[in-house]
A protein has these predicted regions:
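NAD(P)H-dependent oxidoreductase Rossmann-fold/reductase module
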Residues: 1-124
Length: 124
């Protein structure tokens, strides 16, 4: 999210107001992601979790993305996703962020580090 917040700042500084940057996450959702990319231990743990109420359906996991793509008045300095237990499940809304998530110095350093490591320079 810090990378997205830095992108927001850079777009605002260059007066690009037609672009909106939002951050969302699905929470804990029953998808094939773990089955296709997780190691054996992760797969076993996730399969066990899927037997509990701590994992929601893939459809519910998509709701934060749909909300961010369709709602017009969302705060750009936020994280949207499930707001229930451990922010893994529950109603969709604005999540809780720690104060360091808004650390401008770290955001800028992350942006520059990303440019250095990828060899790409964003012309914003």
């Amino acid at each position: 999210m810090m990378f997205a917040f830095e992108l927001q700042d850079r777009l605002a500084a260059s007066n690009k107001k037609s672009v909106k940057v939002l951050v969302c996450h699905p929470g804990s959702a029953k998808t094939s992601l773990i089955e296709t990319s997780g190691n054996l231990t992760t797969k076993i743990i996730f399969r066990s979790l899927c037997l509990t109420p701590m994992v929601q359906t893939a459809e519910r996991g998509s709701w934060p993305s749909v909300m961010c793509a369709t709602e017009t008045n969302l705060d750009q300095r936020a994280l949207y996703g499930p707001t229930g237990r451990m922010e893994w499940i529950g109603p969709i809304g604005k999540g809780k962020l720690e104060p360091y998530a808004y650390d401008k110095d770290v955001m800028s350093k992350l942006w520059l580090f990303s440019e250095q490591k990828t060899g790409l320079t964003w012309q914003i």
